[in-house]
């Protein structure tokens, strides 16, 4: 404010000096010009508030503000369009069987059967099967050198082996050392041995686990049936834990490390 008053004072002084006559007066004429000096007045009072101006230009984009809180969950939208069909999935596990359905209607009657011709054909086939069975049995006995019953097949192996090796050989063929558990089986084995012209063979009886407690090669215990020869078993030299059969059908206990022929036994059900 003081600066403005000082400026006004200077301007007034200059204006006053300009009005004084100069040292060389000039004649007044028609061409004379008058000089006017405008001196600013004092600052007036504040005017009335003007009208609202036009909107200014948009300012610069400000910095990104902080992330606001999550808003409320919106309403469920409408169902969208169906997407593309996806790839075929892997095959699932087999489900449980369903309930048995109701019986179906009876079928139409079949054609009349010519039973007499069929019976005749079946009878002829039965005869052929019986003949083939007999021929096969003969081939087994004559060529293969085996003997058989309704449930067993016996094979005489002409290879000298110790008892343990003989048992392994029979097992490798799918059987075991022969086990005469009754009179019929013992008689068949003895006849087989005699017809082959052999004096003795290993059979599937031993007391390797417990002295004097003889068992068959399938580990079943001996019961009432036996064919021990007179004075047997005697466990001579305290080493006779295995059993042989002689051509007469009798049994002797012998040393297991002795080598001789042996007889194998096979179940027909497992053949």
UniProtKB/Swiss-Prot annotation:
Residues bound to Ca(2+) 3: 211, 238, 241
Coiled coil: 114-148
Chain spans, region Disordered: 44-113
Composition skew (Basic and acidic residues), residue ranges: 45-54, 66-75
Residues spanning the signal sequence: 1-25
Pfam families: Collagen, Lectin_C
Source organism, top-level taxon: Eukaryota
Residues binding a carbohydrate, per UniProt: 200, 240, 244, 252-254
Record family assignment: Belongs to the COLEC10/COLEC11 family.
Disease entry from the Swiss-Prot or TrEMBL record: 3MC syndrome 2: A form of 3MC syndrome, an autosomal recessive disorder characterized by facial dysmorphism, craniosynostosis, learning disability, and genital, limb and vesicorenal anomalies. Facial features include hypertelorism, blepharophimosis, blepharoptosis and highly arched eyebrows, cleft lip and/or palate. The term 3MC syndrome includes Carnevale, Mingarelli, Malpuech, and Michels syndromes.
Protein name: Collectin-11
